[in-house]
């Protein structure tokens, strides 16, 4: 973590004396990573006598949009990352209402697993997307959560890819990776869009 901080300060051409405050993610996330980050931030805050600001990971994703233009309420945020797939309704500043999200795997997890199964490696997101651009939607995959709720599911889609690849290999058939990546991405992203559009219509 120290090396990352030093590299960041060097790239910004700044010193710790020029930093106004220290922000640190306290939740949600992997416990080990959070503990390391919080302890490091507390140490920096103590040593350099800087205010310490606790930040919610999901709120950080949402409020990062203020860097482009000020957010206007009410708003609907679709938060998508390796560990999260959530629909958050905000009627005002720091007013978060979780109205839907994945019931099992996050979409980022699903991308990583699919990339590994079809031999694209890690990280899955950019590799699956690149392969999908070269492919056609030729594989018939299940449409998850085809209902009126705002909830999503990606584990069934992931399992269907794993089973499809296994069965094709058992039969001695070639798996068309680009086509499978395209078919998967179309179904996965369609679910995000459908659920977001449903929420927009309601709220």
List where the protein language model places each region.
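General beta-strand structural signal in soluble alpha/beta enzymes
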Residues: 24, 52-57, 124
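Short beta-strand-loop/turn "lid" adjacent to the catalytic site in phosphate-handling enzymes
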Residues: 6-42, 46
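Glycine-rich phosphate-binding loop plus the immediately following alpha-helix
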Residues: 92-134, 158-159, 163-167
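A contiguous, well-structured pocket-lining segment that forms one wall/lid of small-molecule binding clefts
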Residues: 130-203
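Conserved phosphate-binding catalytic cores of ATP/NTP-utilizing and phosphoryl-transfer enzymes
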Residues: 54-76
């Amino acid at each position: 973590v120290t090396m990352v901080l030093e590299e960041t300060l060097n790239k910004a051409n700044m010193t710790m004396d020029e930093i106004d405050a220290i922000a640190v993610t306290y939740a949600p996330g992997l416990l080990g990573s959070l503990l390391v980050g919080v302890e490091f931030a507390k140490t920096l805050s103590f040593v350099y006598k800087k205010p310490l600001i606790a930040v919610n990971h999901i709120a950080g994703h949402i409020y990062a949009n203020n860097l482009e233009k000020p957010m206007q309420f009410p708003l609907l945020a679709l938060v998508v990352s390796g560990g999260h797939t959530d629909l958050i309704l905000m009627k005002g500043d720091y007013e978060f209402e979780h109205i839907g999200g994945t019931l099992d795997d996050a979409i980022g997890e699903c991308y990583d697993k699919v990339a590994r199964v079809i031999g694209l490696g890690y990280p899955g997101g950019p590799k699956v997307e690149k392969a999908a651009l070269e492919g056609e939607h030729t594989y018939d995959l299940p449409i998850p959560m085809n209902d009126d709720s705002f909830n999503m599911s990606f584990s069934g889609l992931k399992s269907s890819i794993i089973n499809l690849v296994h069965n094709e290999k058992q039969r001695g058939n070639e798996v068309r990776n680009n086509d499978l990546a395209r078919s998967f991405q179309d179904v996965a992203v369609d679910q995000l869009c459908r659920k977001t559009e449903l929420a927009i219509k309601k709220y």
